[in-house]
Amino acid sequence: MQVEYEQESGTFIPPSAKTVNDLLDEYMSIYGVNTWAMSTYESRKSLIANYIRPLIGDMKLEDVTPRIMDKYYRDLLSVKAVSSKYVKARTEYLTPHTVREVHKTLRNAFNQAVKWELMTRNPVEHATLPKEEHKTRDIWTAEVLQKALEACDDDILRLAINLAFSCSLRMGELLGLTWDCVDISPASIELGQASIFVEKELQRVNREAMADLDGKDIMFKFPPTFASTH
């Protein structure tokens, strides 16, 4: 880790945040860019920009208390959900699930603040959070899959459906699948060891997040002309 290396080498500059906004700036630049994957960085940056900075960003760290944070989490349920350029908000107001995602981000940020000796304790360590209803997802049965395959007249789509079902591939993994991930050699088939091993996935990534992370973990980027026409 870069932070640990700088601490050991004596080149680490301790954070000096005074407000929640200051803390978030240093949390993102010191912790986030070195720890999070691209998709995590982008989603947490969005949560911070839309639901944390506008509401409590100007608060001084010394004024952030458990009581204030409990009220903040409660009030978030009446905040309108923000749509992004590519993803439309599914509900009018924030759901308990999103509030819990905000809490995870703040809990981690305040933990770093305690570690950096900017706060004496984490004000959300024992926070009261809205209850989240867990809904069971509808899962295709083998019969439904068979009907879908029979109704599909596109060979590539039929193959994608088969792979997604038989290999439990997520959409990004399915779209990132290349021949180097596949082992169907005669020897592997004979031994019953034919396999698919996916270590990459296709994602739509915000250019700003890509720049912030200096292209970390990106294996291939489509040319702008391709991205704008497909």
Region locations from a protein language model:
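Short, conserved phosphate-binding/catalytic loop or strand-edge motifs used
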Residues: E62-L77, E125-P130
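Short, amphipathic alpha-helical segments that act as regulatory/interfacial helices
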Residues: E4, I48-A49, H103-V114, I161-F165
